[in-house]
Amino acid sequence: MAPNLRKSHPLLKMINNSLIDLPTPSNISAWWNFGSLLGICLMTQILTGLLLAMHYTADTTLAFSSVAHTCRNVQYGWLIRNLHANGASFFFICIYLHIGRGFYYGSYLYKETWNTGIILLLTLMATAFVGYVLPWGQMSFWGATVITNLFSAIPYIGQTLVEWAWGGFSVDNPTLTRFFALHFLLPFAIAGLTLIHLTFLHESGSNNPLGIMSNCDKIPFHPYFTLKDILGFTLMFLPLTSLALFSPNLLGDPENFTPANPLVTPPHIKPEWYFLFAYAILRSIPNKLGGVLALAASVLILFLSPFLHKAKQRTMTFRPLSQLLFWILVTNLFILTWVGSQPVEHPFIIIGQLASITYFTILLILFPVIGTLENKMLNY
């Protein structure tokens, strides 16, 4: 009998073992769809981004008008731009849900997969930040100024570091040029990291909603989960296209329709919605260095998850107290997101400070304590 090319060809064999004959737990739920959705998001963003880059000019005098030109004069340029801008939002929705799933079901116990995932998140955040600067509107310019300025809080080398990043003494043409270069490069770095992420995942195999060994009950990825993933793609593309076609500017800032002007500061500088929770934590501390450290900690704290897991059970499926705490944490993140979009005045300042304290308390103290308590209740 002739050998099956899919199983014998050196390249096809790798694809086959990752996407076709991959043994998959039979009981994984729709929460396991977000990994493939993130892959689709990345491909969509790279494709639309490439098409936009063909019409974009990374120069302070031309950037804003080149984006306007793309939307007005390029065939379907408006659609490509709207899909790219809103695609970023969906990318973050998917990654936050993906991380939330990992946290709820104890997937962070696969340390290598979890750590590469956090590095992916940080790279995605960097990509989104430099990308937001490119249209060179008011919020692009001032967002870049404010966020890059945070590095000046680093003792001794801070100011030098910022001027080195800017390529001058303020955000100007060299900054825009290098941000465009970075925005073009980083998505390919994300694609490379994704392969590492998947390699680590396939070393151990997928986790499942029960958090138990599933080796005795595995099914092939194709056709079961390929079909399930296609359903996921459809359910994501529907709201994405609806948003891009019906209200493309819903999530954007009106301030960005004004070309960048270093002499006029917008009344309220704020990042895109997906960074607001971290921005709220940054603002909640009155000291600059303290704020920067809290901002970094808000994401880097995820690295500690495997070490803060004290429960004998892996997932939260049968741990009602941890479930309650988890949903309080989710609510708290929504509160932080809302506070980040509000001006710095009473009562938002105190709400932001309380929500920031709660965020760190839940993750660092309450989760390990409740996990230990649940062990005691179950007589472990």
UniProtKB/Swiss-Prot annotation:
In the UniProt record, does the keyword Iron occur? Answer: yes
Question: Which sites bind heme b b562?
Answer: 84, 183
PROSITE patterns per record: CYTB_CTER (PS51003), CYTB_NTER (PS51002)
**Which keywords appear in this protein's UniProt record, sorted alphabetically?**
Electron transport, Heme, Iron, Membrane, Metal-binding, Mitochondrion, Mitochondrion inner membrane, Respiratory chain, Transmembrane, Transmembrane helix, Transport, Ubiquinone
Gene3D superfamilies recorded? Cytochrome Bc1 Complex, Chain C (1.20.810.10)
Question: What's the protein's topology in the membrane?
Answer: Multi-pass membrane protein
Q: Where is it chiefly localized?
A: mitochondrion
TM spans (from-to)? 34-54, 78-99, 114-134, 179-199, 227-247, 289-309, 321-341, 348-368
Residues that, per the record, bind heme b b566 = 98, 197
Q: Where does the chain bind a ubiquinone?
A: 202
Single GO BP term:
mitochondrial electron transport, ubiquinol to cytochrome c
Q: How is the cofactor bound?
A: Binds 2 heme b groups non-covalently.
Q: Which GO terms describe its molecular function?
A: metal ion binding; ubiquinol-cytochrome-c reductase activity
Q: Which GO terms describe its cellular component?
A: mitochondrial inner membrane; respiratory chain complex III
Query: InterPro entries, alphabetically?
Result: Cyt_b/b6_C, Cyt_b/b6_C_sf, Cyt_b/b6_N, Cytb/b6-like_sf, Cytochrome_b, Cytochrome_b_C_euk/bac, Cytochrome_b_N_euk/bac, Di-haem_cyt_TM
Q: What are the required cofactors?
A: heme b
Q: Quote the subcellular location field of this record.
A: Mitochondrion inner membrane
Task: Give the source's domain of life in one word.
Answer: Eukaryota
Other comments on record: Heme 1 (or BL or b562) is low-potential and absorbs at about 562 nm, and heme 2 (or BH or b566) is high-potential and absorbs at about 566 nm.
- Subunit structure comment from the entry: The cytochrome bc1 complex contains 11 subunits: 3 respiratory subunits (MT-CYB, CYC1 and UQCRFS1), 2 core proteins (UQCRC1 and UQCRC2) and 6 low-molecular weight proteins (UQCRH/QCR6, UQCRB/QCR7, UQCRQ/QCR8, UQCR10/QCR9, UQCR11/QCR10 and a cleavage product of UQCRFS1). This cytochrome bc1 complex then forms a dimer.
Which family, according to the similarity comment?
Answer: Belongs to the cytochrome b family.
Q: What role is this protein assigned?
A: Component of the ubiquinol-cytochrome c reductase complex (complex III or cytochrome b-c1 complex) that is part of the mitochondrial respiratory chain. The b-c1 complex mediates electron transfer from ubiquinol to cytochrome c. Contributes to the generation of a proton gradient across the mitochondrial membrane that is then used for ATP synthesis.
Protein name per Swiss-Prot or TrEMBL: Cytochrome b
Source organism phylogeny: Eukaryota, Metazoa, Chordata, Craniata, Vertebrata
